[in-house]
Amino acid sequence: MKIGKHAIRRYKKRIGKRTATRERIEKDIKKHIETSTIKKVYYKETGQYRIWTPKFIAVCEKGMVVTILPPNEN
């Protein structure tokens, strides 16, 4: 799964260290998605699916994480 630049920027802003490298943040996002996924929901009208984890919600399009949302947003 690819991680977009916007998703990395949002992750740095909300959760991770701001000085971390892109590769380190990609590993961290992938690890959270693989190990602690709560649920996945597909939205037919937009073609997106969202992956809920305890730390964040990953919004995905075409196999790529587009953005990161806080866990309390829908």
Where are the predicted features?
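Ribonuclease/tRNase effector modules and their secretory precursors
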Residues: 1-74
